[in-house]
Regions:
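Alpha-helical transmembrane signal-anchor/signal-peptide segments
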Residues: 28-39
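C-terminal partner/receptor-binding element of secreted or periplasmic proteins
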Residues: 164-201
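Sec-exported extracytoplasmic/periplasmic mature domains
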Residues: 56, 60-68, 85, 89-96, ...
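Second-shell loop/turn segments in exported
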Residues: 38-46, 71-82, 134
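Mid-length scaffold segments of soluble, non-membrane domains
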Residues: 77-146
Length: 201
């Protein structure tokens, strides 16, 4: 009985996998073309969560001018790496101006992000290169978005911003199109693979 269920699971996974293959490819290309932002609040208090957003704005403002004319994510990552001391200083100045004694630690890393919905687009779950900003003890809620392309501040210019940064029309469509179905397929495909390959006789 268990083997029969595994056969059914295999067939289901195969069919879903064929459908998902193109979406998986788009998702991988999308992750490779973005530099994400992850800001972690010191705590979940109202004050710490409010200043977290001020720090976010200070971080993005410190990078905006240099990122504006870049058209390649690798160049953006290199630029942000060189700017880390300035980013950290800007964030710490923001905290001090708001009357906080906490300090900020910034780093470039790779992190797992959940699926996130924004005003004009959505991003699939996965591992992304990211600028990580931790305030104080870093025990508060997170704020996730994108450093490059500057999508989180693009507003109505979202499509143009994505295009200038080198995202193809297909990938831009992945962000703003039928993303709920596409990302649902990705998540179910991952669950099916884990369930099948982790099962035993």
């Amino acid at each position: 009985m268990k083997k029969q269920l595994r056969r059914i699971a295999f067939v289901t996974a195969f069919v879903l996998g064929v459908f998902a293959w193109g979406i998986v490819t788009d998702s991988r290309e999308l992750r490779e073309g973005l530099l994400r932002l992850h800001v972690v609040g010191a705590s979940d208090s109202a004050e710490d969560q409010e200043v977290k957003l001020l720090v976010r704005d200070a971080v993005l403002a410190s990078l905006e001018e240099g990122l504006h004319d870049l058209t390649d994510v690798d160049a953006a990552v290199d630029y942000v790496y060189r700017m880390l001391p300035r980013v950290e200083a800007a964030a710490n100045r923001c905290l001090a101006a708001a009357g906080f004694t906490d300090t900020v630690a910034v780093s470039l890393t790779e992190e797992a992000f959940p699926t996130r919905d924004y005003d004009n687009f959505s991003l699939p779950a996965g591992v992304y290169r990211a600028l990580r900003v931790v305030i104080g003890e870093g025990e508060g809620r997170n704020w996730w978005c994108v450093v490059f392309p500057q999508l989180c501040m693009a507003g109505e210019d979202f499509v143009e911003t994505a295009s200038v940064a080198g995202l193809s029309p297909e990938l831009t469509g992945t962000l703003e199109g039928e993303y709920e179905l596409r990302f649902w397929v990705l998540e179910k495909w991952g669950e099916m693979k884990n369930r099948f390959f982790d099962s035993s006789d």
